[in-house]
């Protein structure tokens, strides 16, 4: 059977770090308030010369280097973002041009914080059809550009960044590296719980992020538990078989709840929310690359990715690294 295996990963962060103390000087909040409710201690914020595309390019170059392959061998680029450089063309085409992957398929997907899971499943499907042999799957965001910096309930939660993986199609059995199972879902009836109040078709403005946090949390815990069970059932494995869970880094409380639902110790959960905050579509690949590079995630490990975002959208993928 054809399997899409992760051959390398990379990530990128803006230069500027913003601490909770610095935010407390701007809005009515404190380090203690933010840490207690979210687990976040700092975040990275893009400068005037840093964009979703430039972060994506840096993460992609590192992923290609880690995979030991050259850009011209990439057949497909799928970039997940809710904060593209432009309404069009796709930010993926900017990455394609910068890397020199001339002529390859390149497009964006938009599923907010679930975007990387949607992009990964899309690339996996295209590789299995034979339409492409190697793919770059990227999650990249500059969420700082759509935040209301007067709203302390949301501006403290998010940061900017990018993560990328190289996928390669190869024959393999269930023990070989590759994506074992994926599930995606959406529920548009909940769109007004997490959204941006602007857009080119409605207000002709970018708008700002709006969120009803308690309701989002309640839905997230249930939806993520359900989709994780679906993926485990599809793959024919149990939660105890998982070596690592790489969740969307929304906040520490959701990460704790996910671990409890799976019956896993927090030691098996990759946590970067304290350093990176919520980087939306970049969150999962950024956390994955962090854990690969610091030696936690090793070849052969069984890794679960999961995320939920505005829409609502949510999904999970089980990967043999």
Swiss-Prot record:
Protein name according to UniProt: Beta-ketoacyl-[acyl-carrier-protein] synthase III
Highest taxon above the source species: Bacteria
One annotated Gene Ontology cellular component of this protein: cytoplasm
Location of the region described as ACP-binding in the Swiss-Prot/TrEMBL record: 249-253
Pathway: Lipid metabolism; fatty acid biosynthesis
Task of the protein: Catalyzes the condensation reaction of fatty acid synthesis by the addition to an acyl acceptor of two carbons from malonyl-ACP. Catalyzes the first condensation reaction which initiates fatty acid synthesis and may therefore play a role in governing the total rate of fatty acid production. Possesses both acetoacetyl-ACP synthase and acetyl transacylase activities. Its substrate specificity determines the biosynthesis of branched-chain and/or straight-chain of fatty acids.
UniProt GO MF annotations: 3-oxoacyl-[acyl-carrier-protein] synthase activity; beta-ketoacyl-acyl-carrier-protein synthase III activity
């Amino acid at each position: 059977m054809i399997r899409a295996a992760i051959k390398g990963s990379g990530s990128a962060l803006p230069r500027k770090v913003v601490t909770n103390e610095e935010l407390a000087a701007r809005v009515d909040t404190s380090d203690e308030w933010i840490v207690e409710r979210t687990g976040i201690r700092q975040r990275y914020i893009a400068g005037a010369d840093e964009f979703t595309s430039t972060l994506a390019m840096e993460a992609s170059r590192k992923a290609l280097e880690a995979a030991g392959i050259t850009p011209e061998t990439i057949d497909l680029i799928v970039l997940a973002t809710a904060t593209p450089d432009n309404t069009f063309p796709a930010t993926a085409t900017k990455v394609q041009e910068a890397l020199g992957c001339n002529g390859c398929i390149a497009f964006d997907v938009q599923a907010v914080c679930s975007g990387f899971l949607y992009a990964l499943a899309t690339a996996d499907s295209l590789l299995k059809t034979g339409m492409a042999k190697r793919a770059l799957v990227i999650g990249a965001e500059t969420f700082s550009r759509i935040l209301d910096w007067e709203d302390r309930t949301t501006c403290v939660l998010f940061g900017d960044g990018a993560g990328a993986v190289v996928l390669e199609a190869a024959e393999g059995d269930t023990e070989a590296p590759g994506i074992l199972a994926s599930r995606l879902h959406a529920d548009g009836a909940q769109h007004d719980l997490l959204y941006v109040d602007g857009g080119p078709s409605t207000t002709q403005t970018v708008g700002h992020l709006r969120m009803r946090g308690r309701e989002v949390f309640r839905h997230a815990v249930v939806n993520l538990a359900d989709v994780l069970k679906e993926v485990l059932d599809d793959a024919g494995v149990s939660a105890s078989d998982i070596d690592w869970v790489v969740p969307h880094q929304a906040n520490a409380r959701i990460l704790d709840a996910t671990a409890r639902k799976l019956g896993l110790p927090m030691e098996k959960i990759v946590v970067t929310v304290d350093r990176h905050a919520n980087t939306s579509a970049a969150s999962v690949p950024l956390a994955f690359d962090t854990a690969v590079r610091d030696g936690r995630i090793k070849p052969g490990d069984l890794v679960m990715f999961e995320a939920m975002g505005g829409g609502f959208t949510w999904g999970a993928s089980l990967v043999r690294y």
